[in-house]
Amino acid sequence: MKPNFDQNWTTTNGGVPLNDSEVERYIRVVPRPNQVHLAQQPFYCFMHFGMNTANQREWGSGKETVQDFTIKKIKPEQWVRTVKAAGASGIILTCKHHDGFCLWPSEYTSFSVKNTDFDGDIVKQVSDACAAGGLDFGVYLSPWDMHEPTYGTPDYNDYFCNQLTELLTNYGHISEVWFDGAKGADVPNFEYDWARYYALIRKLQPDALISICGPDVRWVGNEGGKTRKSEFCVVPARLADAEKTHEKSQHGEGDAATLKKLNNMDEDLGSRKVLSMARDLIWYPAEVDVSIRKGWFWSKNEDRTVKSARRLFKLYLGSVGNNCTLLLNVPPTNKGVIHPRDAHALKGMGQAIRKMTEHPIITYQLGELQPEQGYIDFDFDSVHKLKYVILSEEIRKSQRVEAFELWAKKPNGKMKRIYKGTVIGMKKIVRLRRGLNCLGVRLVIRQSRSTPDIAEIGFYE
């Protein structure tokens, strides 16, 4: 392939405007401080644990009794050690799943750990272990409650806010509140008071992210670990309503007709074409949620379905390495521990993540590029076997790069394209499976929304 480096963001910019009023509108959208923190700590572990763990089921019925919760103790310190070994920086615990059983001694229901043989408060034990181990702690609270009698009536919103208040005021710093949109087909048509929930969280835990059915983090659209070719953080604001309102939502006249059906499973969420048809835009990064096992809750029948360390590392590269965050579910067993198979796979995953950056060739903090920097050369001190290139944009100035390439300078002096991609965003990890001996790399920004701003680029062998 004959290189053509003259066509770049400083010249043709992919045939689209580098700067105009629309581009300025796009790049005015930037993350809040808690979203910047998320970009710096993009890998958490989900802990599905509760009544379903005791019964070895995926979904309960709401008809369980407190006697069905037969788990008497947990080892949260082991959970924390396992999560840290994997390279994750936080835990999100299912404090109440759809069955309505509460892992803390809630004052508002008897269907709680306080009326079981379990000794203590599970939420407190886990949150304390996270604090001691230097991990973030987040809470999952299911809006759908199959047990609570007030569900489906306005009184349920009071009940839900009371429980939310308990979780947000008794367990230290909460990094994230995770709202699930799932509910059964035969459930009464009941509208949750989302605005009230959000206001309560902003008041009691102002730094907490509100995820999935919330305004801060969006669902990637599947639970299989798949991401889009171009995963944008700047998207139409309407997308934040898609998960919680579904087809019942009313659309404003300011939204174009083609945007009315936009949802988190669409392939194109943030291209210029999509953004041009949206009146309001938000910073709304994608989260990849996937389980280490076949199911979300532990079951001994699924002990042989644990994903290998190699597969988990591949999921990391495809999520964190593709401008997303990763929420990997690791369900504790009915003995209150992470199963040895899960722990072994997670340890191997963490080793692979750390090994990726153990041997840097060079790293640079670039900042905003200059008008003459259509491409930038990075020269090595000698021939190195390049295995990874890791790039990050300065997201506090929005997401700008729309197309880029990496070209390696081979020992014979010839240039070889080693990667052609679109977005960079929070992080882009380019992996050369077999490695490539080279003297350096040329970064070519082909297309951008205004001047590219590259926070860092690193080359690793």
Which residue ranges define each predicted feature?
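Exposed beta-strand face motif in extracellular beta-rich ectodomains
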Residues: N437-V441
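Mature catalytic domains of secreted/periplasmic carbohydrate-active enzymes
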Residues: K2-R434, V444-Y460
